[in-house]
From Swiss-Prot:
Top-level division of the source organism's lineage: Bacteria
Lineage start: Bacteria, Pseudomonadati, Pseudomonadota, Gammaproteobacteria, Enterobacterales
Name this polypeptide is given: ATP synthase subunit a
Membrane-protein topology: Multi-pass membrane protein
Family: Belongs to the ATPase A chain family.
Amino acid sequence: MASENMTPQEYIGHHLNNLQLDLRTFSLVDPQNPPATFWTLNIDSMFFSVVLGLLFLVMFRSVAKKATSGVPGKFQTAIELIVGFVHGSVKDMYHGKSKLIAPLALTIFVWVFLMNLMDLLPIDLLPYIAEHWLGLPATRVVPSADVNITLSMALGVFILILFYSIKMKGIGGFAKELTLQPFNHWAFIPVNLILEGVSLLSKPVSLGLRLFGNMYAGELIFILIAGLLPWWSQWILNVPWAIFHILIITLQAFIFMVLTIVYLSMASEEH
């Protein structure tokens, strides 16, 4: 469906549709009649998240190979500032001993930032190319506005939380943490298990949904501006919102990184 023939409601709905693959038939899903099934894959979210992850690796590897001890270039300086900032954050917040945390925090911060940054592209640019040049029925370009991506990343963090908890405290110590806190008496084990279980499970859920909610709302505002206002007046709201959104993009990447460090630091504490 060409965007110029859409009503505002159809335009907004079209831009909120993902390019989906039905894993049962390996055929593209019709965005106008999507099946209510678990067995669908959001191809666009997967594609852009992988591409941006590879871009991160290529950029940082290139800078690492060309790094000089002399006066660095602007790009090398920017990368060094990011690395120094993340390293300082990990040093301040993580009190355990692990060589994995700093690279993990750096990866999360830059990767989430790049995914968020896609929200600043013109809302119709890549969807127009995908529809008119590639014949794709729908395309969304902001991976972090897809709850499947954010919850998948949060699930990875959750697995690391469990790993470090068991590694540092042992299975017995981890079990005691779940069953003997906050009430240190065997009679309260069921209550403790419920309280600690909810607290533990809420970490990845809140981590993923916070990022998704903020980025989805930001994307939706851009779509509303483009879909409801005439083209000649869109810049009046688009430019201020884009400038403000730069802060949101950076802040959400920072929050995701910080909470990951804090959760892993809590998991690594020995009691």
